[in-house]
From Swiss-Prot:
UniProt superkingdom: Bacteria
Lipidation (S-diacylglycerol cysteine): 17
Membrane topology of the entry: Lipid-anchor
Predominant localisation class: membrane
An individual GO BP term: carbohydrate metabolic process
The keyword Repeat appears for this protein: no
Protein name: Unsaturated 3S-rhamnoglycuronyl hydrolase
EC number from the UniProt entry: 3.2.1.-
Length: 377
């Protein structure tokens, strides 16, 4: 993922969401059903009126955004969400983006699959482009699979960066479910395990973003100023958020389901341990002082995943205060016009955000979180 135009971040903007100029929410019940639904719709309306993407309307940024829109519709049944989903699917001609080897470029198909599952009109949806992408992505050779694409990120496995575990596996899983072709799920598991074995730190129970941040025990290891390993909040949010989406649709009797349940629980326990007091995770999970202000996209993915686990009974109620604290802090990061601020720009490692910085995937993460907070009331 290449960076788009960087938002200007000044020293004056580096403070927590809870200290913004926005009117504090202490007097409002941010857990009131109407308040949550209104906040979510305002976020949708603002984002639809201010489209943004990295390289194309079908890229991963919109993939993550419209995944949030789909889950918001799933919970609320508000047709404004479905209208947005259908409009973009038709405008995109139901196409993923063009790089068939790249997990990022099929993330948009989660929204297509969701529309197809919920649309009563025959022949409205066209999932053939998604099938073509998945068949090529999973079953045909490319330089990454062959291990010949040597680079600083070590692009020698298909999903060499942890973000990929949000982008492709939930789509593959949902397609396998809808098409009744479980063999797709087995292929997904094969590539998921490659990423897990390379990037998951079993001691820290967190994922390195890519091979650059994996410790080998030498002087070349990347460290934070405090000497800790570099673990990116949004990167781990991609993973645990993707796990929630994956487990949502994975068959209960799938032979590898226990692996994903256990990984989810391990990560959830670690994410809970390192939550800052104000509720929002910092962009650097083990060095919060590096950028000592909350960041919404990673925090929203964490909140979505934890709330989902509580609602499904996978984790117990001890997580509830943390989820509520995070949601309250995120609510204070939403501008009055609906824009979701304090979102780190496109990147691959911890960097600062500001109260005015936004991205469509940050809005999508906010909608994901809200969709599960609504069920917790």
């Amino acid at each position: 993922m290449n960076k788009s135009i960087l938002l200007l971040v000044t020293l004056l903007s580096l403070y927590s969401c809870t200290d913004t100029e926005k009117t504090p929410l202490e007097e409002k019940d941010v857990f009131n059903e109407d308040y949550i639904k209104t906040s979510m719709i305002k976020a949708l309306e603002w984002q639809e009126a201010h489209p943004i993407f990295a390289i194309h309307p079908t890229d991963w940024t919109n993939g993550a955004y419209y995944t949030g829109v789909a889950r918001a519709h799933h919970t609320t049944k508000n047709m404004m969400y479905m209208a947005a989903l259908k409009n973009q699917a038709v405008a995109n001609n139901w196409q993923p983006y063009t790089r068939l080897y790249h997990a990022d470029d099929v993330a948009i198909s989660y929204s297509y699959l969701y529309v197809a599952e919920n649309e009563k009109r025959r022949n409205f949806s066209d999932l053939e482009p998604t099938k073509k992408f998945l068949d090529t992505h999973l079953y045909e050779d490319n330089a990454w699979k062959a291990g010949t694409n040597r680079s600083k990120e070590d692009k020698t496995i298909l999903w060499w960066w942890c973000d990929a575990l949000f982008m492709a596996p939930p789509v593959i899983n949902l397609y396998a479910k809808q098409s009744e072709q479980p063999e797709y799920l087995d292929e997904m598991h094969k590539y998921y395990m490659e990423t897990y074995n390379r990037l998951y730190d079993k001691e820290e129970k967190l994922f390195a973003r890519d091979s650059r941040f994996v410790w080998d025990g030498d002087d070349e290891d990347k460290k934070e100023p405090n000497g800790e390993k570099v673990f990116w909040s949004r990167g781990n949010g991609w993973v645990i958020g993707g796990l929630a989406l994956l487990l949502e649709d994975m068959p209960e009797d799938y032979k590898h389901r226990d692996f994903y349940v256990n990984l989810y629980k391990e990560m959830a326990s670690r994410i809970l341990e390192i939550q800052p007091e104000d509720g929002l995770w910092r962009t650097s999970l083990l060095s919060p002082e590096s950028y000592d202000h909350g960041e919404v996209s990673g925090s929203a993915f964490h909140t979505f995943a934890l709330a989902w686990g509580i609602n499904k009974g996978l984790i117990d109620k001890k997580y509830t205060p943390a989820v509520k604290k995070a949601w309250k802090a995120m609510a204070n990061c939403q501008h009055d016009d609906g824009r979701v601020g304090w979102v780190q720009n496109i990147g691959a490692f911890p960097e600062p955000a500001s109260k005015d910085s936004y991205q469509n995937f940050g809005t999508g993460a906010f909608l994901l979180a809200g969709s599960e907070i609504l069920k917790m009331r």
